[in-house]
From Swiss-Prot:
SUPFAM superfamilies: FMT C-terminal domain-like, Formyltransferase. Gene3D superfamilies: Formyl transferase, C-terminal domain (3.10.25.10), Formyl transferase, N-terminal domain (3.40.50.170). GO terms for molecular function: methionyl-tRNA formyltransferase activity. This is Methionyl-tRNA formyltransferase. It comes from Methylococcus capsulatus (strain ATCC 33009 / NCIMB 11132 / Bath). It comes from the Bacteria. (6S)-5,6,7,8-tetrahydrofolate binds at S109, L110, L111, P112. It is an enzyme of class 2 (transferase). It catalyses: L-methionyl-tRNA(fMet) + (6R)-10-formyltetrahydrofolate = N-formyl-L-methionyl-tRNA(fMet) + (6S)-5,6,7,8-tetrahydrofolate + H(+). The lineage of its organism: Bacteria, Pseudomonadati, Pseudomonadota, Gammaproteobacteria, Methylococcales. NCBIfam families: fmt. PANTHER family: METHIONYL-TRNA FORMYLTRANSFERASE, METHIONYL-TRNA FORMYLTRANSFERASE, MITOCHONDRIAL. Belongs to the Fmt family. The gene is fmt. InterPro entries: Fmt, Formyl_trans_C, Formyl_trans_C_sf, Formyl_transf_N, Formyl_transf_N_sf, Formyl_transferase-like_C_sf, Met-tRNA-FMT_C, Met-tRNA-FMT_N.
Length: 308
């Protein structure tokens, strides 16, 4: 079976690697154009491109798939199937009709819950106890195609977007390889999504990272976990931004105004609208990440408040 793979970030790498390892190396790999990355903002290839080059796979990097020349190039590849994982570009209808068995996408949620750009973060923010991956046929509407398979996993109290991202990326790769024979035989029956159960995972905005200490400790803990590794939860201490990488809920808490530092000797505990948050790892401006204990050793915080 001739497979075209389309993906860009780290989330897509396990699936491409699994296709290669299973004896189904793609006849072509599509990925987004090289872009500035890292602290130096140097132009760098995507993680998918790096893996494709390592294995000698042809790589295409169009800025868009909307032009007729891109459809013609895809037609020339004579694909049986196009596998899409976090590609980042819209596949127009003329492209969707090219592969013999269509185009499929691995989405990082149990559809129809959390269609959209940020399903992992939104699942954590909502307090979901379970998430997973869905293999679906791609249709013009966003994440709305028939579902060909699902795999689920639990969301632990300590899970961050980073940890869940890696688990789901591996789960998606395993699912695709398991379902590949059915795709090749064109015998997978798609399950129509229940539109009454749809929720949308809006793109994460950097402004969401600022913690509001009036909120309860549980919701603030979810924000810390959801925004690790980006954009990273933050607060202010005497007008200076303090990033918070890790925290845990304490309950009950002393009666103190939200944002008040209620312990600052062995632990850094902060009063919330309900309950309290124990901050475990922070990052001051221009500094590395450090444990709250190391931060406390260098700062006198008794009687101070966060968010000021």
């Amino acid at each position: 079976m001739r497979i075209v793979f389309a993906g860009t970030p780290e989330f897509a790498v396990p699936t491409l690697r699994a296709l290669i390892a299973s004896g189904h190396p793609p006849c072509a790999v599509y990925t987004q154009p090289d872009r500035p990355a890292g602290r130096g903002r140097k132009i760098a290839p995507s993680p998918v491109k790096q893996l494709a080059i390592e294995h000698g796979l042809p790589v295409f990097q169009p800025a868009s798939l909307k032009g007729p020349e891109e459809r013609e190039r895809l037609v020339a590849l004579e694909p049986d199937l196009m596998v899409v994982v976090a590609y980042g570009l819209i596949l127009p209808t003329p492209v969707l009709t090219v592969p013999r068995f269509g185009c499929v996408n691995i989405h990082a949620s149990l559809l129809p819950r959390w269609r959209g750009a940020a399903p992992i973060q939104r699942a954590i923010l909502a307090g979901d106890r379970e998430t997973g991956v869905t293999l679906m046929r791609i249709e013009p509407r966003l994440d709305a195609g028939p579902m060909l398979g699902k795999r689920s996993c639990s969301i632990g109290d300590d899970d961050t977007t980073a940890s869940l991202h890696d688990r789901l990326a591996g789960l998606g790769a395993e699912m695709l390889i398991e379902l590949l024979p059915g795709l090749a035989a064109d015998r997978l029956t798609g399950e129509i999504q229940d539109e009454s159960q749809v929720t949308y995972a809006e793109k994460i905005e950097k402004s969401e990272a600022r913690l509001d200490w009036q909120k309860d400790a549980t919701s603030l803990s979810r924000r810390v976990r959801a925004f690790n590794p980006w954009p990273v939860a933050e607060t202010t201490l005497e007008g200076t931004v303090l990033r918070i990488w890790s925290a845990q809920v304490l309950d009950p808490a002393p009666d103190a105004p939200p944002g008040s530092i209620i312990a600052c000797t062995k632990n850094l505990d902060v009063a919330c609208g309900r309950g309290a948050l124990r901050i475990l790892e922070v990052q001051p401006p221009g500094k590395r990440r450090m444990s709250a204990k190391d931060f406390l050793n260098a700062h006198a915080l008794a009687g101070k408040r966060l968010g000021t």
